[in-house]
Amino acid sequence: MITTSGGGALICRSAEDANEIMWYATQARDAYPYYQHTAIGYNYRMSNVCAGIGRGQMKVLDAHIAHHKHVQALYEELLKDVPGVHIHKQPATGEYDSNFWLCTMTLDPQVKIKGQENAYKEVIKTAVGGAAGVIHQVDSPTTDCQPNDNVEALRVWMLNKKVECRPVWKPMHKQPVYAGTDVYTNGVEEEIFKVGMCLPAGPYVSDEDVRYIVDCIKEAIL
């Protein structure tokens, strides 16, 4: 919601917590006249320029949250009668007040999408999501944990309609970099990854945009 051009801010419960976090964030150096480390440190410090951006963004925080809540409500209303399509909602227990930074939907496995027969037939040449930088090319378009064919088909369909929709985040334990590590799971996160999709909901997404996105989703369903 507030990125400060890099990832946001961390609010701590105490000065002690803040001090420990900053120790890790500033290379975790021990008090010697040379570099010694008893823990693995990082270099997460925010520049003065980014801090200034963050202070400026705080002025529009309330407006951004209100906009995201409005977009979420509009998606819920426009998609409520579409069979097999479900917008992830806030639990109605009164315990939560989501800022709806991310608007997600799930697609039932039995829902058929136009072009579904071509899902995962070609290797992606660029990073999905407009990510900058260098990507590692792959030989196979499929992995052992991926969105269902209808979700991938809908992503491609929306992209062809000039709408960028992304899969939800792949579970960490299914990332190749963590292959072989211990994991304790009930499988829910893998099921969500198979059926989930993120919808556009940023500050520049208008009511007209949401209606167009919903119309494209409806058009894609067979």
Question: Which residue stretches match the model-derived regions?
Answer:
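PLP-dependent aminotransferase class I/II
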Residues: 13-222
